[in-house]
Amino acid sequence: MDNKFLLKSSLLLIMSGTLLTACSDNDDTLGQVLGTLEEEESQFGKANDVFTAAEWYPGGEQGTTTKASYSAVAPCAEQMGLETSFNKGEDFFEHLYTYTDEPRKGLGPAWVRSSCIHCHPSYGHGKRQTEYRANTIGNGYLLVVYHPDEAFTEDGVRYTDFPSNYIAEVTGMPQTKAMEPFKAPIDENQITITWKKVEGSMPSGLPLHFPDGETYELIYPEVNIPVTAFNTNPKPTNYEVRLESTIGIYGTGQLDAISTEDMKAQYAAEANYAQLNPRMWNTTAQDWAEGAYYTLADGTKAIKKFTYAMTRASLQDGAGANAIWNITNVTRSDRRYLYSTTAWAKAMSEDPEVINYIRQNGKDKSSLVHPYYADTDEKIAEKVFTMLDMNTAAKGGDNYTAAFGEAEMSDKDYYDFMVWHRGLAVPAARNLDDTTVQRGKVVFNKIGCASCHRPSWQTKEDNYWVDNSIKAYANANGLDANQILPKFSYQTIWPYTDMVQHRLFMENDIRTGWCRTTPLWGRGLSLRLTGAEDRLHDCRARNEIEAIMWHAYSKQSDAYSSAKKFYELKKEDRDAVVKFLRSI
C-alpha cells in the first residue's frame, strides 16, 4: 500500500476552519510524513476562483483520505470504530484463497482468480495485457463470451447490440482455472489477445493527429478463443469474445449512497437531449423501464447502478459482494451453491481422466476429491455431474452442505469484507490551486465533458440494503444490521459520473455497446500507485488523450461533439484538461 501523504509538503488541512486528521492505514511502515508549512502558505482545502473548498474532498468529508492511496480507510469507518473489521476485510481482499487453509478456504472446484487483488492491482484499475493468464497480478480482464447481435453505425462501425446474450456453456465470468483432476471450463493457454492499431483516420473522419501536428495512436484488442479451448458439453457456437477490465474499488460505498430519486432526475434530464438505453429508461413515460429494476435476494426491487452493464443495484449484492463468491467459488451462508454451468458438469462427468483420477485417489477421506468418490465409475460420474451442477440455490442449499460441508466463508468474515469494501476512502484531489489545473476544469466544462462526467452528487440518508449473510451476523450478535456498515449520508461527493450508460461505438466495443460512465475521481494517481494508467473498459487507452479520442471514433458516439471540440483545442488547453484529470 502507498501511504505517502498527498500534499507536496504535508500541507495543513483546512476545512471549515477546523483541522482534519489524515485517515490512518494499517501499514505505517510505508508512510512518509513530510514537513509542514506555515498555515497561511497552504492552499489545500481552500476555495479559489474555479474550485470550491469541497472539491478537495471528492469522497466528501466522511469519505476522503489525504493519503496517496486507494486502500485507506474512510473517516466515517474510523468514527464508527470499524477499523478492526476493515483491516480483517482487507486481508480477504489482498491474500490468496486456498482449498483448505483457514480463513481463506474453499477455492474451486473452478475459479476465475485465486484472490481479489490479482484483478485490482493496488486496489485500482486493471492493467492492459498481451496474453490472458489468470495468475498474473494486474490482469483485471474478465472474458466476455457472447452470441453477437450485429449492427452498424452510419459511418460503418460494426458493433454488437442488445441483447448479445452470454453463452450458456460457461459462467458469465468465465473460469480458466480448476482443481485437479477437473479441467478448467476454458483452457487459457489457447486464448490469444492481439492488439491492433487504427490506421489513417477514424470512421468519423478525424485523423490521428491534431491540427497542430501532434500525433496520437489508438489501439484495440482482438480476442480469440477457439472452440477446442472449451471443456464443456455441448461446446458453444456462434460466439465472440471481448475483454472487460476491473475499475478501482475505492468510492463504491459513496456511489451506493446516491439516491434512486437523484438518479431518476439525472436520467430525465439527459433524456431531453440524449438517446438513453431503452432497457433502463422509458422515454415516452419519462420513467424507469422494466429492465432498470434488479431483484435483490430478499425480493426487493431496486434500480441498477453498478457495473459497466448496470447489472447490480446494491453494493451488498454488487460486484464485490458477488465476486468474493463467484471469482473464487467460495460459498457463504446465503450462497450455498457453486458458480458453474451444467455444460461443464456434464463434460467433467464424461471425462475418463477425471473419473480415473477420482477412482484412484478419492477413497481416502482426507482426499480433496473424496466427496466425488463412489465404488463404480458410473456412480463417480453421477456424483461428479450432480455435485458440479449445484449451481442454483434450488440445486444447492442443504444438498450442497450434505455433499461438501458447511459454507466456507463465515458470516463474520463476510461482514468484515463488506466493512472494508464500503469503507474505502477516495484520495483527495491535488493541485487545485494550480492555474493550469484550473484552466483544465474550465475547458473540460466548456466543451461538454461534464454532460456525462457529472462532477458532483449530494447524498441523502444512506439507507443501504442489507443482505442475508450480514443480517445473520447481526442477529447472532444482537446488532442492528442497518447500522453496522459505513454510511455516507449527506455528503457532497465528486465522482465525475452521471451514473448513466452511453455508447461510444468504438471498434470491438463493449458487448451491447452500452457502458456506464466510469468515475474519474482518483484516476490521476493510477500510474504512481499501480504502475499503469490504462483506461476504458478494456484498457485500450494508455493515457488520457487516447481515452478522449476514442470518444470521437464514430460520429454516432454520444460524446462525439465534446471529443471533437477537444480535438480542435490548442495544445496548451489539451494539456490543461489532462492535468485537470490527473488532479481530481
Functional labels for PLM-detected ranges:
Residues 1-10:
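Bacterial N-terminal signal peptides that target proteins for export
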Residues 28-87, 96-418, 422-435, 446-584:
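Electron-transfer interface patches adjacent to heme c in soluble/periplasmic c-type cytochromes
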